[in-house]
């Protein structure tokens, strides 16, 4: 199992990963991941977050290294654009608008919707369309296409079930999680203090509402996927320096450039060697100046 570079607890603190929800909203199943509370807000134990993040990143790395497909899922407003951005950067797939029931368990229906989307695009791009259809009909087709794109843009090239699901906000994405469980698809998920960690193969205790936190998670996820992809390409004899595209992964030139910039994984210890005293002091200082996005 490959090991990644140590997770920087200070970086997690700066991103507000330690801020949970109000104590009145907690899920008792998260008790073991909670460090304490400040002003009626639960504080997440970042030592556990760092260690479990390392495990989750290794799962992402190994999945992509073996040519597996990853589906990133988060339809909440503050995560939507970030999820799409980083999924595209690492050549993977995403759902960021609305989870359509059966996206995993009833793939045939979803495939039909994707086919419908492609037909609409082809029709609208045709020069004959302006002659054969009225302006109203063209407008109706354009609206249908846009609606389908909102839900399907990130999975239109996904021809089979994903090998790993990566979720931010398990409460909001419970339907996606239930479908993945039915199909035995392993799940990486950020679990906040109001979350249920059951059925999550790789839980990462952390704030799932803060934009800064979400961006940090997605950046780490994408880097792990890119490193796995690079390793897979090396095994296949692909020269990343001269490669212009990799159709199986739907890579863009931006993705290839990102591959070259991604820091390498190392076989070092998974977590920063901070003492409990240092961690306690850093956490205390952070809580004194807290700026939580959770409620």
From Swiss-Prot:
It holds the Pfam family Ribosomal_S2. One of its GO terms (molecular function) is structural constituent of ribosome. Keywords: Ribonucleoprotein, Ribosomal protein. The keyword Hydrolase does not apply. It comes from the Bacteria. One of its GO terms (cellular component) is cytosolic small ribosomal subunit. One of its GO terms (biological process) is translation. Belongs to the universal ribosomal protein uS2 family. NCBIfam families: rpsB_bact. This is Small ribosomal subunit protein uS2. It comes from Rickettsia typhi (strain ATCC VR-144 / Wilmington). The lineage of its organism: Bacteria, Pseudomonadati, Pseudomonadota, Alphaproteobacteria, Rickettsiales. The gene is rpsB.
